[in-house]
From Swiss-Prot:
This is Hemoglobin subunit beta-1. The modification Phosphoserine is found at residues 44, 50. Belongs to the globin family. Heterotetramer of two alpha chains and two beta chains. CDD domains: Hb-beta-like. It comes from Panthera leo (Lion). GO terms for cellular component: blood microparticle; haptoglobin-hemoglobin complex; hemoglobin complex.
Length: 146
């Protein structure tokens, strides 16, 4: 496994306290605000005209919730991320043609949101473990490009 037993413990320990629905909406919203070019995949989502509009957009929140619930399911299969994300990789890569760089950006935004929510608890060791996880997930999602 790309994570040690200790790292898995840190990731699962923090993740058990995450409000997945709320954090998902915030992470996707921040992605669209911070990296505005990612908005082109969400043109059907309505008003994305300002940071406030994006962060309060119900469709953004709903998709963010969906995204993070999938991420959460993936954590249960941490030793087979490629398998866990095969279908989503196919959808995003083959059908939607999402640039895989966007998966990496969202992973980094998620790390920021977790740091923001958990403060001191999100210490350097926890961050290091989560960076490995989001990199692993991004790589699994980009798998169809290789």
């Amino acid at each position: 496994s790309f994570l040690s037993a200790e790292e898995k413990g840190l990731v699962n320990g923090l993740w058990s306290k995450v409000n997945v629905d709320e954090v998902g909406g915030e992470a996707l919203g921040r992605l669209l605000v911070v990296y505005p070019w990612t908005q082109r995949f969400f043109q059907s989502f309505g008003d994305l005209s300002s940071a406030d509009a994006i962060m309060s957009n119900a469709k953004v929140k709903a998709h963010g919730k969906k995204v993070l619930n999938s991420f959460s399911d993936g954590l249960k299969n941490i030793d087979d991320l490629k398998g866990a994300f095969a279908k989503l990789s196919e959808l995003h890569c083959d059908k939607l043609h999402v640039d895989p760089e966007n998966f990496r950006l969202l992973g980094n935004v998620l790390v920021c949101v977790l740091a923001h929510h958990f403060g001191h608890e999100f210490n350097p060791q926890v961050q290091a473990a989560f960076q490995k996880v989001v990199a692993g997930v991004a790589s699994a999602l980009a798998h169809r490009y290789h």
